[in-house]
Amino acid sequence: MKVIFTQDVKGKGKKGEIKEVPVGYANNFLLKNKLAVEATPGNLKQLEAQKKRVEADKQQELEDAQALKEKLEALEVNVTAKSGEGGRLFGSVSSKQVADALNKQHGIKIDKRKMDLHDGIRSLGYTNVPVKLHNKVIGTLKVHVTEA
């Protein structure tokens, strides 16, 4: 019997996969526990429509990330921090502070974990911060650190 898996089943198939399985296994386990549905023409059409919808969503997500990248690269975020001799900061400017400043100044919310700022910004001036917006899209945000 051909079935379409609705969930991952260890050793048998992944979600959305169409496979031939024994009739007893399909009726007594997969269909009963709603792990799969029978591969009827209607269900196959529904699966195709769902795959197209998911693909369209992924494409839209990528386009949104590209647009946000262009927007970010045109912006500049200003952050103030206390500094000592020679422009060295007391402590550092973290990705959380940069994300908060971006939200306050430009109304753009980006998760601090998407900013690639391992040790923070430790000096006054301009710094380019890489921001991972999507698997394939990495933008750059210009951060200007000034003395408080």
UniProtKB/Swiss-Prot annotation:
Q: Which InterPro entries match?
A: Ribosomal_bL9 (IPR000244), Ribosomal_bL9/RNase_H1_N (IPR009027), Ribosomal_bL9_bac/chp (IPR020594), Ribosomal_bL9_C (IPR020069), Ribosomal_bL9_C_sf (IPR036791), Ribosomal_bL9_N (IPR020070), Ribosomal_bL9_N_sf (IPR036935)
Mind telling me which GO cellular component terms the entry cites?
Answer: ribonucleoprotein complex; ribosome
Which top-level group of life is the source organism from? Bacteria
A GO MF term = structural constituent of ribosome
Gene3D superfamilies linked to this entry: Ribosomal protein L9, C-terminal domain, Ribosomal protein L9, N-terminal domain
Q: Has keyword Lyase? A: no
Protein's GO biological process: translation
Q: Which keywords does the record carry? A: Ribonucleoprotein, Ribosomal protein, RNA-binding, rRNA-binding
Q: Which PANTHER family match?
A: 50S RIBOSOMAL PROTEIN L9
Family indicated by similarity = Belongs to the bacterial ribosomal protein bL9 family.
> What's the stated role of this polypeptide?
Binds to the 23S rRNA.
UniProt name for this protein: Large ribosomal subunit protein bL9
